[in-house]
């Protein structure tokens, strides 16, 4: 069961990547690049592990955008500036324009950066898959 839970997000990411590449959707490519950068530089983003960032309750809608961007801003302010990390924040800033129209405010408790990154990755996968059709139509 645990292997399925670990493999499911990877399968979702792969499906999103394949769709994004096949459709040539620039937003999908940006999401895919950002997910890859977060995965590659997760340890750097986590730092010493003491920072706490609000994560919406999993029972709420998965796209609690305001909290996500507040968390991103908190993480950005607490992360040492390096070119590769700055690219993550540039990508996330670029994506903000596409997703604020779907904004939903949610409440949540403060958790470790690692848990926030898990939530952020799931958030990016969700917008990559669920909204891809809408972005393709609007382009």
From Swiss-Prot:
Descriptive protein name: Interleukin-5
Superkingdom of source: Eukaryota
Subunit structure: Homodimer; disulfide-linked. Interacts with IL5RA. Interacts with CSF2RB.
Annotated keywords: Cytokine, Disulfide bond, Glycoprotein, Growth factor, Secreted, Signal
Species assigned in the record: Notamacropus eugenii (Tammar wallaby)
Extent of the signal sequence: 1-19
Its biological purpose: Homodimeric cytokine expressed predominantly by T-lymphocytes and NK cells that plays an important role in the survival, differentiation, and chemotaxis of eosinophils. Also acts on activated and resting B-cells to induce immunoglobulin production, growth, and differentiation. Mechanistically, exerts its biological effects through a receptor composed of IL5RA subunit and the cytokine receptor common subunit beta/CSF2RB.
Transmembrane segments: none
Any Pfam family hit: IL5
GO biological process: one example: immune response
An annotated Gene Ontology molecular function: interleukin-5 receptor binding
GO cellular component terms attached to this protein's record: extracellular space
Predominant localisation class: secreted
Cellular location(s): Secreted
Positions annotated as glycosylated: 48, 77, 91
Family note: Belongs to the IL-5 family.
InterPro entries reported in the protein's UniProt record: 4_helix_cytokine-like_core, IL-5
